[in-house]
From Swiss-Prot:
The lineage of its organism: Bacteria, Bacillati, Bacillota, Bacilli, Bacillales. The active site is at Y154. PANTHER family: DEHYDROGENASE/REDUCTASE SDR FAMILY MEMBER 11, DEHYDROGENASE_REDUCTASE SDR FAMILY MEMBER 11. GO terms for molecular function: oxidoreductase activity. InterPro entries: NAD(P)-bd_dom_sf (IPR036291), Sc_DH/Rdtase_CS (IPR020904), SDR_fam (IPR002347). It holds the Pfam family adh_short. Substrate binds at S141. It is an enzyme of class 1 (oxidoreductase). This is Uncharacterized oxidoreductase Lin0452. It comes from the Bacteria.
C-alpha cells in the first residue's frame, strides 16, 4: 500500500467528501493536513483521527486567498518535511436559472470552484517540481461533463476544473516533473452542497433528486484512496462516479 506515511493536504475538509476522505486516508496511515474555514469542525475531525491513532493537523484556510494556500503548504512541509498529494475539494453549488441574476453567487462559485483550485495548484507546484513527484487531485462534478437547467455557472466552473487538470497532466508529462493528476466527477453524493442553494425552486428539485438517488461521501473517499494508492508510474486521471440507480 503506497498511502501509508504519505503527507496529504485536503481542502474543503470540514464535511462531506473532504471529511470522509480524511477519515479513510488516516485509517490507511496517511499524515494529513486538513484545511477549511470552519475551525471547530476541523478540530473535531482531527480529534477523531487521533483517537484512532491516526496523524493529522489542520489550518483555517480560505482557498480564495493565495496566501492562505501558500501557508497551508508551508505548514505541511514544516511539520512533515514534504507534501506527497493534495486533494483540492473545496466547492459550492448555489444553482439557479441564469434569469434569476444571482450575480454574487456566480462570483462566489468562480472564486471558490475555479480560483480555489488554481490557488492550490500554484501553492503546491513549486515543491512538487523540485522533488519531481506529487499528486494533485481535484473534485469536479458530472455538471462539468453534462449541462442541465439551473447549473450553468456551476457547470462552467466544474468544466474549468476539468480543463485545468487535463492540461496540468499534459504539461507535467511534457516537462518530466512526474506529477500525477486525478479529476473526480461526482453525481448525487449527499453532502452540504445543497445548503448553498438559495433559489427555492432549484433547491427543491435538487433535494428531490438527492433524496431519491444520493449516496454517502465515503464512496468518493474510496476513489481518492484508490488513485493515491496506484504505483508512481501510473496516472489514473479521471473518475466519473455516481449512484448505480441514478440515470443522470
Amino acid at each position: 500500500m503506497t498511502i501509508k506515511n504519505k503527507v496529504i493536504i485536503i481542502t474543503g475538509a470540514s464535511s462531506g467528501i473532504g471529511e470522509a476522505t480524511a477519515i479513510l486516508l488516516a485509517e490507511k496511515g496517511a499524515k494529513l493536513v486538513l484545511a477549511a474555514r470552519r475551525v471547530e469542525k476541523l478540530e473535531k475531525i482531527v480529534q477523531t483521527i487521533k483517537a484512532s491513532s491516526g496523524e493529522a493537523i489542520f489550518a483555517k484556510t480560505d482557498v480564495t486567498k493565495r496566501e492562505d494556500n501558500k501557508k497551508l503548504v508551508e505548514l505541511a512541509i514544516e511539520r512533515y518535511g514534504k507534501v506527497d498529494a493534495i486533494f483540492l475539494n473545496a466547492g459550492i453549488m448555489p444553482n439557479s436559472p441564469l434569469s434569476a441574476l444571482k450575480e454574487d453567487e456566480w462570483e462566489q462559485m468562480i472564486d471558490i470552484n475555479i480560483k480555489g483550485v488554481l490557488n492550490g495548484i500554484a501553492a503546491v507546484l513549486p515543491s512538487f517540481i523540485a522533488q519531481k513527484s506529487g499528486h494533485i487531485i481535484a473534485t469536479s462534478s458530472v455538471a462539468g461533463l453534462k449541462a442541465y437547467p439551473g447549473g450553468a455557472v456551476y457547470g462552467a466552473t466544474k468544466w474549468a476544473v476539468r480543463d485545468l487538470m487535463e492540461v496540468l497532466r499534459m504539461e507535467s508529462a511534457q516537462e518530466g516533473t512526474n506529477i500525477r493528476t486525478a479529476t473526480i466527477y461526482p453525481a448525487a453524493i449527499n453532502t452540504e452542497l445543497l445548503e448553498t442553494i438559495t433559489d427555492k425552486e432549484t433547491e427543491q428539485g435538487m433535494t428531490n433528486l438527492y433524496k431519491q438517488y444520493g449516496v454517502t461521501p465515503d464512496r468518493i473517499a474510496s476513489i481518492v484512496a484508490y488513485a493515491i494508492d496506484q504505483p508512481e508510474d501510473i496516472n489514473v486521471n479521471e473518475f466519473t462516479v455516481g449512484p448505480t440507480t441514478q440515470p443522470w
